[in-house]
Amino acid sequence: MKLLHTYNEYEQYLTHQKKKTEDPVRREKWLTQEWDLKLDGFKTIFSNLLRNSVLEKNQRALCIGARTGQEIVALRKLGLEASGIDIVPHEDLVLEGDMHDLQYEDSSFDFVFSNVFDHSLYPEKMISEIERVLKVDGHCLIQFQLKIPSDEYSENEIESIDHDVLSLFEQSKIIHSESINRNFAGMNWEIL
């Protein structure tokens, strides 16, 4: 994995990442013209997981890097008890939280979703935290961009799925790791 930025301290990383989420032009776009597109896209993804018995109604779900919360709303509409975190909170939907230090008890969630792997400064810590908060029989879906030019807020670039990502899962069984059609959020690979 290639790291794209160097910081003298962790606060510099957080400040850099917050710039994207706090950008008023981006936020307005996420909350208006992209809201329905992303909400419908997430509902499709999660509906497929329900149909395939990966998810069940009333399960507890956590969305990491949820920004303005479309994935949370989608999961709630499908009957899950969903919450989300981001380094910048959003109204009642998204709580302030750090993907590298999840403030939840061990085995708290049946499902964890994230599509911000590329924004992780410490991917091994992010995956370790996901595994810690997942229940033993829980599922995690991570979607990301592979071999697609990143923006200035990406912290890492995946060079090898097996080495850079799959090897980080120490307590999990990989159900699939596969290419997907580039979706509404620009993601083209997913791991379940």
At which residue positions do the language-model features occur?
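Core SAM-dependent methyltransferase catalytic element
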Residues: S172-L192
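A short SAM/SAH-binding and catalytic strip from SAM-dependent methyltransferases
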Residues: D110-P123
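Conserved class I S-adenosyl-L-methionine
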Residues: L141-E170
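A short glycine-rich, Lys/Arg-flanked "PGG" loop and its adjoining helix->strand segment in the class I
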Residues: E124-H139
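Class I SAM-dependent methyltransferase Rossmann-like catalytic core
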Residues: M1-S53
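A short acidic, Gly/Pro-enriched loop at the edge of an enzyme's catalytic core
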Residues: H100-V112
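Class I SAM-dependent methyltransferase SAM/SAH-binding core
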Residues: R60-D101
